[in-house]
Amino acid sequence: MTSSSYTDIDTLAINTIRTLAVDTTAHAKSGHPGAPMGLAPAAHVLFSRIMKFNPAHPKWLNRDRFILSNGHACVLQYIMCHLLGYKLTIEDLKQFRQVGSKTPGHPETHNPDLNIETGAGPLGQGIASAVGLAIGKAHSAAVYNKPGFDLFSNYTFCFLGDGCLQEGVSSEACSLAGHLKLSNLIAVWDNNKITIDGATSMSFDEDVEKRFEAYGWNIVRVANGDTDLDGIEKGFREAMSCTDKPTLINLKTTIGYGSELQGTHSVHGSPLKPEDCVHVKKLFGFDPTKTFQVPPEVYAYYKERVAIASSAEEEYKKMYASYKQSYPDLSNQLERILSRKFPEGWEKHLPVYKPGDKAVATRKLSEIVLDALCPVLPELVGGSADLTPSNLTRWEGAADFQPPSSKLGTYAGRYIRYGIREHGMAGIMNGLAVYGPIIPYGGTFLNFVSYAAGAVRMAALNNSRVIYVATHDSIGLGEDGPTHQPIETFAHFRAMPNINCWRPADGNETSAAYYSALTSDSTPSILALTRQNLPQLENSTIENALKGGYVMLENKEADITLVGTGSEVSLCIDTVKTLETEYNLKARVVSLPCWEVFEQQPESYRLSVIPDGIPAMSVEVWATNGWRRYVHEAFGMHTFGDSGPAPKLYEKFHFTTSGVAQRAKKTVDAYKDIPYIRSPVRRAF
């Protein structure tokens, strides 16, 4: 019989995790005790024997990363944070799922003192982010590692459940991970065969192992994840020994292990009943009359294990000091990027345009920006969801990020071929954004950012600097028709907190959009870009556009303010002459490329742009939702588009000088008898 390195103290520690999961959810009268009870052995082995980390410095560079994709099991992560010595107390556990606590109902990134790399909640988002973290490591290692200096050698460990595997985003991300041969990625499948509805057999009976083998993953099996600690450790070690594939560990567990309801969906998403709490504590040798019990020897044991895990940081510091002497340029570059600073004068590389310059589509103007910035910002890592020739996201001289064995590129490459995987791309970029030395951007059609909305929302919630290059932004894309023409898309994202939604009207505004996106340290940005050519406008400057809105054409005697974005700004300018010749009306024109940035300006400035005294009317070939905060009347789209040449579509939907002028005339007439027209910018709150 083989002797085990695990003893009674390990069993006690695991059962402490389980009883804390019971008490934390019971105290909150809310939460998911089942998965934490089932995964307690795997978490114990991972953090006590496998991972390198340091609770005293949670963000040290070469730490192993842990992602809890089945985020409803977050009480497990909070308990481990407490036991391992992160800044999370028993009182914090007692505040689980309470307003303003360190322990919300799903993992969030707002507390840098914990080991939460990125938020997780909607199932599948965590594993997609884990793929991004793994790409981040592979790329950073290829760029910065040198013989004898493994600056980046960490693993990414991801716990995920049956629900994550059923979500489409996990398929997209894991398929790409297999293609990219991300051997530093280890996913642990909590194979307990239970979801909220009941047994997975009701809806999910595919062969997951064969599916992942088809993706190009290595498969490791652990038959008893409930008690076989040696088997669990062996599984991790075997996964770490694989050097050419990511690994899926098929860990068979019992949900709610120790509960009278173990192995059933009843223990998934509700606290245990009081009598069951007593049962669990008696079963594991704890006093059933007490709560939140942690034996002193368990604290002592984890302190000892943490000392071993954190020793890697001290060795790393010594290595980095030598690296800095040997490779000063690379170390200076890395330190600059990690400090979230840009090279001096980088903004001078932004293209600047003057009126009369050639009319160019803003997607092409975006490409010109990338051509200018990517050579001077090595932290920019781009890609596209198989629309590179349309999105124009690959800068001149770019090299692809590919496994070296593919002969298609190297891990040092900075352009990722995401394939037709919009949601996967966005989820992966969330991981890239938090790895460290990377600012990710990814391209697709604006309409298909809707496919990625779940991951975009997580970027906003996580305060991640991610850039979505969203081309073909309206009916102006033409013949592909309404399946590809966004109508309601931007209204959705404009309604989302903490995301900047840019729709530039010309070259200077496009440069401004990129400047804003890059310098918005904790906010993602969407850049909506045209397929059709747009003129370079008279009063457009980068400085003006960086205010989010500004006066493009002033007239102190104006009867109306026309407010446009993107391709409709030039239409508004052209309409001014039509209004004067046909209706004897004078108009001023405002460009409003980014509502969110405009909102950050003082009210006095916003009132100078959209003043009192005359009505304001918006012109935008999208749904009009949200415009009432800036204008009195909104001209937009109220149906889907159509298939045909872009000019014909603009005619059909009346986005012409005559169509805009007619509506402007009606707006002026509607407000002419109102003695004082108040700007919509003036709001009570």
Swiss-Prot record:
Residues holding Mg(2+): D162, N192, I194
Active site (UniProt): E422
Binding site for substrate: H32, H268, R363, S390, H472, D480, R531
GO molecular function, one term: metal ion binding
Residues annotated as binding thiamine diphosphate: H72, G121, P122, L123, G163, N192, H268, E422, F448
EC number, UniProt record: 2.2.1.1
Site (Important for catalytic activity): H32, H268
Catalysed transformations (reactions): D-sedoheptulose 7-phosphate + D-glyceraldehyde 3-phosphate = aldehydo-D-ribose 5-phosphate + D-xylulose 5-phosphate
Keywords assigned by UniProt, alphabetized: Calcium, Magnesium, Metal-binding, Thiamine pyrophosphate, Transferase
Family annotation (Pfam families): Transket_pyr, Transketolase_C_1, Transketolase_N
GO CC terms: cytosol; nucleus
CC cofactor: Mg(2+); Ca(2+); Mn(2+); Co(2+)
Biological role stated in the UniProt entry: Catalyzes the transfer of a two-carbon ketol group from a ketose donor to an aldose acceptor, via a covalent intermediate with the cofactor thiamine pyrophosphate.
Family of this protein: Belongs to the transketolase family.
Subunit field text: Homodimer.
Protein name, entry field: Probable transketolase
